[in-house]
Structures are given as C-alpha cells and as structure tokens.
C-alpha cells in the first residue's frame, strides 16, 4: 500500500485530493526499502512523492489560469422498454409454472402508452391510490431520469512568486467548483486552497524553508444518495412511473426522497505548517531537520426529512423514506451532526553526502 507524501524537500503524509494541481512541480515514486530508508515506517511500502513548487529569484511574477469543463456519466446501461420487460417477466413466470405477473389488461395499457394512444402512466387502484409496479404502465428509463447529461465545473488558479538570490517566496491559491451528475437533488463539491512558501539562505551553510498550506473541502449531496439508492436504481421496473398523472413524484420512485428527503453537508479543513533547517558544514554534506504539523477538522450535518406521496385527488400523505428497508417510519425525521479534530505531527532528521567519481 503506497502512501502520498507532499512537500518540497520536506514531506508530510497527505491526500492528493488536497493538493492544487497547479502547485505540483514533479511526481516520483519510491519503492519499499528506498522510501523506508528516508521516511521511515510511514513509507514502508513505498511512496508517491509529490514535490510542490517553490519561489524563484527575480522580479515578482503573477500568474493566473482558469478553466471550465463538463462531465458526463459513461457506461450507463441501456434500459429495456416496459412492454418487452413485461413480456419477459410473464414468460419467466410461466416457465416456472406460475401465472402472469402483468395481467392482459395491464399489457394493453403498457402498449397503448408506448404507442401514444394513452397518456396516463398509471390508473386508480379503486381506493384513490395510484397503481404501482406490476399494475402500472409507464415506460421509464431510470438512469435517464436520475443522471444528468452533463455536469459543469470550473477552476481558477492564482500564484505570485519572486525573490532575490538569498530569499525566494511563493504564494498561490485556487478554487474548484464541481457539480454532480444527479438530476434530482443537489450534489456538488468545492475546494479552496491557499499556500505560502518562503526560503532564505541565512548564511552560506544554513538555509531555512517555511511553508504553510490550507485546504477546505465542501461537499453537499442528498442524504438519500447512498448505497441503497444505487442498489435500487439498477433494479427499478420501467413500468413504474417517475411521476403520477397529476405530475407529482410517484410513490417508491425515489424522486421525492432525492429532492426533499434531506441533505448531507460536510466541510473539512486541512492546515499544514512545515519548517525545514538545512545545514551544510562542508561542501556536499547536508544535515536536514524537518518538522511539520497538520491539523484536520471536519464538520458534518446529515438530515432525514419527511417525504410524501400523492393520491389520485392530489392530496399528500406520508410515505417511507428508505423504500421499505425499515430504518425510518413514514413521516419520521432525524438530524445528526458531528465534528472532530486531528493533529498529526512529524519530524525527520537525516543527513546525506554527495560525491561524484
């Protein structure tokens, strides 16, 4: 298992997701013993070493870059149309000695809806509730219903660097805004980074480097966007409509849960401060003393809100939030909030001597 070490000559274990790509100078891989000999037990199985940029001598240089892009889901399954689906189910039931899953009258409605001679996706069950599943006649592509065709994102980067022969500095910042692919409910990710680094040669044989890095990650999604949602999505019947004939979200269609069933917000901050002292008592012999501290804080809010289905008259009534998995009764609500803080300290003292023969 490889670890990610981020830094410029001095290193601290970190997540690559917290690094602004524009701040990367180089990426290298050290394997097993080679990495352990330098970074100890934290790198016993190898490391991916990401070296970040440093300031350069010369006039102050200001650089900006920005980009906009779009994402799309790939490899999305093609869904069988509802009439073919119903035929397959009836045939499978007959093969095991059972009766029709879809009655002849329902088959007629399914075909009529596909041909455009019937506008309603379902009918009254006789008790003022819309028919579902094997008694409905919709033609829903559920992947098309829940996945958007494109998701925009934007990224902006700004850096300032410069210095003299003895002192160099670099200040950089970035902003990433990435929208999710869900059509119902809001899912998005935002990342902010701010970095600073200064290196100064105190004497000919003593150099000091100080760097600081702050990264914030904001993540929002519907609380319902969990494993059960994706489990259900691939198993939904195309005959079950996403909306009833009145235009309301259909019971057990999960559109209501995604849009109004609550949301999850997460905010995570990473603060990293690093100090490196390099002594060179004689030419090509360097003694390195590194110290760093990374503080990680996270706050998370997760809520479940009541969700509704609608009867034939258009009146709302409570329905289960989690599609019958039994975790929440119809009409129930819940809020969970938690926060935590972690301090991670590292020190590294090593020496190297370079001689070319």
What are the functions of these language-model segments?
Residues 13, 33-38, 55-58, 70-73, ...:
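Short beta-strands and strand-coil junctions in structured, solvent-facing domains, enriched
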Residues 49-51, 63, 157-161, 197, ...:
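Outer-membrane beta-barrel architecture
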Residues 21, 57, 153, 164-165, ...:
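Outer-membrane beta-barrel channels and translocator barrels
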Residues 13-31:
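Short acidic/polar hinge/loop motifs at secondary-structure boundaries
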Residues 57-138, 176, 180-272, 288-290, ...:
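Surface-exposed loop/interface segments of Gram-negative outer-membrane beta-barrel transport/assembly proteins
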Residues 27-28, 48-50:
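Non-catalytic regulatory/gating segments with a bias toward low-complexity or hydrophobic composition
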């Amino acid at each position: 298992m490889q670890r990610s070490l981020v830094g410029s000559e001095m290193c601290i274990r970190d997540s690559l997701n917290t690094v602004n790509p524009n701040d990367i100078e180089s990426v290298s891989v050290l394997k097993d013993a080679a990495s352990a000999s330098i970074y100890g037990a934290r790198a016993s199985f190898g490391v991916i070493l990401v070296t970040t940029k440093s300031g350069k001598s010369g006039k102050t240089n200001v650089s900006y870059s920005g980009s906009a892009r779009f994402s799309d889901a790939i490899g999305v399954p093609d869904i069988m149309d509802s009439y073919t689906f119903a035929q397959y189910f009836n045939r499978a039931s007959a093969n095991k000695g059972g009766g029709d899953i879809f009655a002849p009258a329902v088959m007629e409605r399914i075909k009529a809806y596909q041909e455009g001679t019937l506008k309603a996706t379902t009918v009254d069950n006789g008790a003022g509730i819309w028919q579902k599943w094997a008694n409905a006649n919709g033609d829903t592509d559920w992947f098309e219903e829940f996945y958007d065709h494109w998701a925009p994102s934007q990224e902006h980067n700004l850096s300032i660097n410069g210095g003299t022969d003895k002192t160099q500095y670099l200040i950089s910042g970035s902003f990433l805004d990435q929208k999710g692919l869900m059509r119902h409910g809001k899912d998005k990710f935002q990342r902010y980074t701010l970095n600073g680094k200064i290196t100064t040669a105190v004497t000919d044989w003593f150099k000091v480097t100080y760097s600081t890095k702050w990264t914030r990650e904001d993540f929002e999604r519907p609380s319902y966007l969990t494993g059960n949602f994706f489990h259900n999505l691939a198993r939904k019947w195309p005959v079950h409509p996403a909306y009833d004939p009145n235009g309301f979200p259909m019971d057990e269609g999960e559109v209501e849960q995604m849009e109004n069933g609550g949301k999850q917000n997460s905010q995570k901050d990473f603060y990293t401060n690093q100090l490196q002292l390099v002594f060179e008592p004689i030419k090509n012999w360097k003694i390195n003393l590194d110290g760093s501290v990374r503080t990680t804080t996270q706050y998370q809010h997760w809520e479940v809100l009541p969700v509704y289905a609608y009867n034939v008259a258009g009146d709302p009534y409570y329905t289960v939030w989690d599609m019958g998995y039994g975790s929440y009764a119809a009409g129930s609500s819940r809020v969970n909030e938690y926060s935590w803080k972690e301090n991670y300290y590292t020190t590294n003292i090593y020496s190297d001597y370079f001689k070319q023969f």
